[in-house]
């Protein structure tokens, strides 16, 4: 993808620089910790009962973890041990937290809307959407991940910080941290990374200058490989000391890092969080499907940028809206033609999405940190044969 920078000098003179910023956070960030616990509870349910209905919320604060929500399942998830195991895996002492659990069954009104006919033996295709909402999927050709470059850079930084901590390469790093990457664009072309902010928890006696040297040696070269970052300003722990972190420093909640989970400021967000929700909740499954469609449109070279927006009504299977926006980068047809092709080529019902993307597999705790998009091992990231789709636009 380095050729994306070749024509920077020849861009039109009237195109003014623009700046975009993307953020990512480590697993020990209090909000992400809550997402991770919620998705671990979801996985425990799906592992034993793929038809589980889960809406799990978590709050983490000083000395306390509270798990609450609506769960209907034949599984018997050990919520307390799930919380303890997650805390230990992230890097916190589970003995330091009192765990409270407030789980009850899904509302019968919601259950009746999602599965109105199943009790009478109807096919699973009658599954209605678990809620109303708007879901957005986005893709572009800036990186091999089909994501904006600063989004990928931020995700890489967090991943490398996690690896450096867990392997002991940089032993002074703590579980909590966040990064921010600002990039200059000329039109739609990324030109250079201008600013990188790294705020990372550390031990009391850590030499910050030595920590900066270790990041320069082990993290930044890999994080920015293939990216124009030579002149980037690196700002490490701008608040100064960062010894106390996680829930001891800030209260965390599920669903508080929506833009970190998706595309930063490059695409709008419908407002529905992902973590802790089973795939009948279109907040999650609809967003995954929208990303899958957008990525395949770009990967097939129908467009260089694509945004797919879906909207659902609770209890109804078919979306009430399908919109495609290629920002003028599709030469094959108009965007309304692409939207019509999406309706014809894909089953956009909750049951159809679940089947297409195999969403009853217990994989969700792996999505909770590092971004839900851009990693090839997730089924909504696969690039498929688009011949059927293309036939609908010809």
Q: Can you say where each PLM-predicted feature lies in the sequence?
A:
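A short glycine-rich, hydrophobically flanked beta-strand micro-motif that places a catalytic Asp/Glu
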Residues: 52-56, 177-183, 232-236, 302-313
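Alpha-helical support elements that line or immediately flank enzyme active sites
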Residues: 27-46, 142-159, 277-301
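Short, charge-patterned binding micro-sites
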Residues: 55-73, 314-318
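Glycine-rich anion/phosphate-binding loop at the beta-strand->alpha-helix junction
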Residues: 206-297, 301
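N-terminal, positively charged regions that mediate nucleic acid binding
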Residues: 2-55
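Glycine-rich, mobile lid/loop segments that gate access to catalytic sites or pores
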Residues: 21, 63, 81, 88, ...
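Internal helix-turn-beta structural module
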Residues: 61, 305, 311-394
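Conserved phosphate/anionic-ligand binding catalytic regions in large, soluble enzymes, centered on
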Residues: 23-25, 29-34, 128-143, 243-267, ...
């Amino acid at each position: 993808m380095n050729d994306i920078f070749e024509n920077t000098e020849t861009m039109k003179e009237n195109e003014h620089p623009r700046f975009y910023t993307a953020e990512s956070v480590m697993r020990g960030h209090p909000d992400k910790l809550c997402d991770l616990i919620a998705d671990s509870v979801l996985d425990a349910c799906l592992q034993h009962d793929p038809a589980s209905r889960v809406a799990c919320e978590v709050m983490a604060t000083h000395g306390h973890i509270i798990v609450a929500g609506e769960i209907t399942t034949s599984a018997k998830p050990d919520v307390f041990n799930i919380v303890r195991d997650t805390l230990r895996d992230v890097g916190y002492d589970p003995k330091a937290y009192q765990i409270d659990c407030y789980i009850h069954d899904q509302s019968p009104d919601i259950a009746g809307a999602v599965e109105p006919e199943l009790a009478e033996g109807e096919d699973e295709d009658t599954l209605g959407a678990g809620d109303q909402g708007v879901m957005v999927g986005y893709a572009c050709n800036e990186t091999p991940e089909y994501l904006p470059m600063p989004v990928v850079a931020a995700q890489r930084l967090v991943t490398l910080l996690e690896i450096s901590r867990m392997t002991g390469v940089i032993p002074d790093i703590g579980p909590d941290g966040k990064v921010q990457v600002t990039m200059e664009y000329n039109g739609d072309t990324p030109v250079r990374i201008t600013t990188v902010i790294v705020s990372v928890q550390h031990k009391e006696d850590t030499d910050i200058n030595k920590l900066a040297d270790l990041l320069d040696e082990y993290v930044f070269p890999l994080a920015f490989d293939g990216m124009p970052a030579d002149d980037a300003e690196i700002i490490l722990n701008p608040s100064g000391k960062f010894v106390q972190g996680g829930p001891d420093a800030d209260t965390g909640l599920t669903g508080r890092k929506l833009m970190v989970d998706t595309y930063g400021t490059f695409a709008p967000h419908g407002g529905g969080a992902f973590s802790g929700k089973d795939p009948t909740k279109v907040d999650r499954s609809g967003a995954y499907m929208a990303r899958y469609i957008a990525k395949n449109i770009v990967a097939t070279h129908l467009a260089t940028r694509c945004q797919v927006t879906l909207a659902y009504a609770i209890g109804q299977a078919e979306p009430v809206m399908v919109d495609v926006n290629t920002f003028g980068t599709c030469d094959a047809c108009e965007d309304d033609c692409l939207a019509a092709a999406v309706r014809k080529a894909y089953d956009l019902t909750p049951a159809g999405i679940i089947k297409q993307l195999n969403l009853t597999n217990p994989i969700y705790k792996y999505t909770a940190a590092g971004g839900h998009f851009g990693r090839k091992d997730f089924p909504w990231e696969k690039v498929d044969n688009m011949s059927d789709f293309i036939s609908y636009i010809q």
